[in-house]
Amino acid sequence: PPLNLSLVDTLVAQGPPEWRFPPFRPERPRTFLKNPLALLGKRDVLLYHPFEDYAAVERFAEAALAEEVEEVWATLYRTGEENPLAEALIAAARKGKRVHVLLEGRARFDELLNLRWYLRLVRAGVEVLPLPERKVHAKAFLILTREGGYAHLGTGNYNPTNGHHYTDFSLFTARKEVVAEVRAFFQAMAEEKTPRLGLLRTGEGIRRLLLEAVLHEAHPKGRLILKFNHLTDPELLEALVYAASRGARVDLLVRSTLTRLHPAIRAKSLVGRFLEHARAAAFRAGGEWRVYLTSADAMPRNF
């Protein structure tokens, strides 16, 4: 029979202290936590959880209760049993804000929990958007005011347990062009249409962007780093092999499934205290690094 890995938690809990990591205290972005919207009016904020406190995401959600906020949009995927961010959405709706949530009911293993949250959200007056044909895996939170808006885009789930144990990026911004894109994404979801975006990418658009970027690096001075949980897309793997064969340095950080290896490609799996969860792709592009973040793994079903 397969090994029951849940027993490892019990084993470590009952074992000697040297089996356990010392207490961990994340860095707290104090200025952001004090007034996230005020700081975002001045500059963008990029955090890497859990080294930088996931509480920043929950504090951003609580900013939806501010007087100047008129409307809130959010995606919820793996909610968990207790979720301050979801509670903030409920509180905002009860305070009279227009709150719209895309609650993905097909998150594997969390279907019943998400159904419970669905009932709570609806009772509070939140508009829960109809599920589109395709699973929505994007992690986006949008706050709209009379003057403009603020957006959060992340690689991780809006889930406090995950937020303290998974490595993930969070980008917070008030840039008008990004806010407009996130708003267009949510509007398309509400109207059950395919999003037409310029800055952001979804589905097949992610694959096209990655393929173009990889092939652009297919020369002796090329340099690229890809980090995913799963890297199984045949087209992308073929492009990586081609770039490496043309002399590019290709580094892969893949936590779980990698379906093709090549002598010219460096591939590693990071195993440590936290679960590697951030997905990122970096390309040097002639000296200037371009970095893309995504919540999606490089798998055919996701593209």
What are these regions (language model features)?
Residues 249-253:
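Hydrophobic alpha/beta core scaffold segments
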